[in-house]
Amino acid sequence: MALDNLTPDRHQQIIINMSAERTAVVKGIAGSGKSLTLLKKAKQVSTLTNSYAIIVYTKSLKQFFVDELAEIGQTKNHVFYFKEWQKSTKPNFKYMFVDECQDFNAEEIADFRAHGRYCWFFGDTNQSIMGFEPTIYSPGHTVQSVEDTAKQIGVHPQDLCINHRLTIENAKVGEMIYPQTRLSFACIKHGPKPRLIKSVAQLDKIIELINGGLTDVGILVYYNNQVTFIRDYFQSRGIPVQWKTYDEMDIDFKSTSPKIITWHCAKGLQFNDVFIPCCGLNEYKQYVSFNIDPMAEKIPALYVATTRPLENLYLIYSNKLAPVLPVASSPIYSGNKSVANGPF
C-alpha cells in the first residue's frame, strides 16, 4: 500500500491538518488508520527535516514502516523497534512518532519525550498485549493505557472513529471477543462473512485456498515454534513464504508470498486474507509443548489477530472450537442462516 494512496476521512484529516509542532495522543479502534495517519504525519515532517523518528514495539511493524517510507525516498534509519531503541545511543529528534503506544509504560513514554521535542503517540487500549509477567528468564514488561498516556502528558486524546479495514461481517468476530468495543458499528463496508472451517488437515486446507489465487495472505499463530513449523511445511510443499519469529525474520511486505507471523507481531498490520489455524482448544499442542492454550488464555492477542483482515477471515479448527469464538452454528459465519445482528 503506497503512502499516497491513503485517502483520509474527516477524523484523520483533522490529525493531518494539525501542526506537527506539538505533543499529541491519537487513539482509535482497530482498523481506524492510526498507522497510516502516522505515516502521513511523518511524510509531512520529512519534507522539512531529517530529524524525526518512528518508534514501534516489533520488528515486523518496523519493516512495514521501512517499506512505506522507502516509497518516498526515506531510509530505514528513521525507524526503531523497541529493543533496538533501548540499545541505541538514543539520539534526540525534533519529531518523534510512537505507534501502538499502549505497548509501553509510563517510564518508557517519559524516555521517548526526553528525546523528542514534539512527540506523537498513536494507540488503542483494547489492543494492549505487550504486558508480560516476570519469569526466571525475563524481568517482564508493564504497559499503560492510551488514556493514561494522555493524562501523563497532559493532553486530551484525539479520536479516530471509523474502521476502514474491517468489514462489518468480519468485525463481528472481534466484537464477540470484546463486546464493549461495538466494533462492527464503527465499520462502513460490507464483505464476505468469516469462514469457519473444520479440518483435520489444517495446513493442507490453507494451502488449497492459497493456491486458488490469493496474493495478500497472513497466517497468524500464537507461538514462534508454530511459525517455524508452518514455514517448513509450506516450503516442503514448494510454497515460498515470508515469516517472522522472535529472533529471526525473512519478510518483505511487498511480496505476494504468504506471511507467517505471530499474533503479537501482526499488530499494526493488515492482509486481504487472514488465516487463523488452531482455533480449537489445545490444538496448538500439535506444534509446541507449552502449557498455555492461547485460545483460552491469550484473548487480547486473539482479538488483535481477528482484526487484521481487509476482506476475508478464515478460522480453522479440528475438534472443539474455542468458546471465546462464536459457536459453529452462529449466523456470523458464512453458510449459516442470517438473523438481525449488528448495525446494518
Question: Where do the protein language model's features map onto the residues?
Answer:
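Conserved helicase motor core of SF1/SF2 NTP-dependent helicases
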Residues: 2-74, 85-304, 308-344
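Conserved SAM-binding strand-loop segment of SAM-dependent methyltransferases
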Residues: 75-81
